[in-house]
Regions:
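Tandem amphipathic alpha-helical repeat scaffolds
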Residues: 9-19, 49-61, 89-103, 129-144, ...
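Solenoid-like repeat scaffolds
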Residues: 19, 33-41, 73-82, 116-126, ...
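Active-site/pore-lining binding-face segments in mid-to-C-terminal subdomains
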Residues: 223-313
Length: 356
């Protein structure tokens, strides 16, 4: 069949061309999936999408992930004898994160999906560790620290298996919790396995270092802030080279640090790199980025700056000269809008308090 050769050709090109970005790969996988769909070939459509959602992990926006994952779920439900549910259970964890990141998704919808995820783990004989970890992360974000501690204990006591989150991600979440409850020194101690390079994954320790650096700046711990910036910058090199836009909020924290540390030009360089990523992101990534950049801009006395910014930026001008005060107002306004949406969804005031 000619169409299967077209699909195989695209898959070969994806595997053979090492210069392709995740976004390039997603686009080509979608082409292959469209060919399969046009020929009513569910099996090829399924196989291609399993690969496609793997690449979605490096995208800042979760729209593609949610769309293609929904297709996989429907294919499995309609043909349970054709496919293995374990093919996509790991990626289900990413989907949960994207639902929390989108303020348009109600908490009721999230709860229903969480229970579905839990039931699928149980019926496939897996530990509930990733389920508890998700609830731990959610409650930390919402400032429900007693609940967070409850789920942290459940997570840590749950058996580990092939569906469990990697040790570096588990540690990263725990460090976020320690920072949020004011245990900065303990967070700096717990991070040592990452510093010693005993564990790591695609975004950790870069993300972790940026979080500790950000809190160090807020606490006036300048020595620790500089030390963890240095760690973060080294860990970010490959991420920036790979144009991994899903890390935009972490780069935003680096911008904030540099503006406060008197390294303004370097901060603008990172700003120019990360702003296009911001426009590809959504939800919580955008919120974290806008807050960090706004906080950084508050530290500057500069009035105008020459920048090469994307043409889709609301303040873009051909002269490439920008008033810093306009940038401050823009990012504060964006942060306030996102905070309002999240707090309305979450029935809380946690996000807007970040801007006080």
């Amino acid at each position: 069949m000619k169409y299967t050769l077209e699909i195989q050709k695209l898959l070969y090109q994806i595997n053979d061309n090492k210069s392709l970005t995740p976004k390039d790969k997603v686009k080509m996988y979608k082409q292959a999936a469209d060919i399969a769909d046009a020929n009513d070939d569910i099996e090829w459509g399924y196989d291609v999408r399993v690969k496609l959602i793997q690449e979605c992990f490096a995208l800042a926006s979760g729209t593609e992930l949610l769309t293609e994952f929904t297709w996989l779920m429907n294919a499995y439900e309609n043909h349970p004898d054709w496919f293995d549910e374990n093919d996509f259970l790991w990626q289900y964890k990413w989907v949960l994160g994207e639902l929390y990141n989108n303020p348009d998704v109600s908490m009721e919808q999230i709860r229903n999906v969480m229970e579905d995820f839990k039931s699928r783990l149980e019926r496939n004989g897996f530990s509930l560790q990733p389920y508890y970890d998700r609830l731990f992360d959610e409650n930390t974000l919402l400032g429900n620290f007693d609940e967070a501690k409850k789920y942290l204990d459940l997570r840590n006591n749950a058996p580990d298996d092939d569906m469990g989150n990697c040790p570096s991600c588990l540690l990263d979440n725990e460090i976020d919790y320690l920072l949020a409850i004011g245990k900065f020194d303990e967070a700096c101690t717990r991070v040592q396995p990452l510093i010693d390079k005993l564990i790591s994954c695609s975004h950790v320790p870069a993300r972790t270092y940026c979080s500790i650096m950000y809190y160090a700046d807020k606490l006036g711990r300048k020595e620790e802030a500089v030390r963890f910036f240095d760690y973060a910058e080294e860990a970010m090199k490959q991420i920036i080279e790979d144009n991994d836009e899903s890390m935009c909020s972490s780069v935003g924290k680096m911008v904030c640090h540099l503006f406060g540390a008197g390294e303004e030009q370097k901060g603008w360089d990172y700003f120019e790199t990360s702003l296009p990523w911001y426009f590809e992101s959504n939800g919580q990534l955008q919120f974290e980025y806008t807050v960090a950049v706004w906080e950084g801009l508050l530290k500057l006395s500069t009035e105008t700056i020459n920048l090469e910014l994307p043409t889709n930026f609301a303040l873009y001008n051909k002269e490439c000269v920008y008033r810093v005060d306009d940038l401050r107002n823009y990012f504060k306004s964006e942060a306030e809008s996102l905070a309002t949406a999240f707090d309305k969804r979450n029935n809380s005031d946690v996000f807007i308090k970040r801007l006080k």
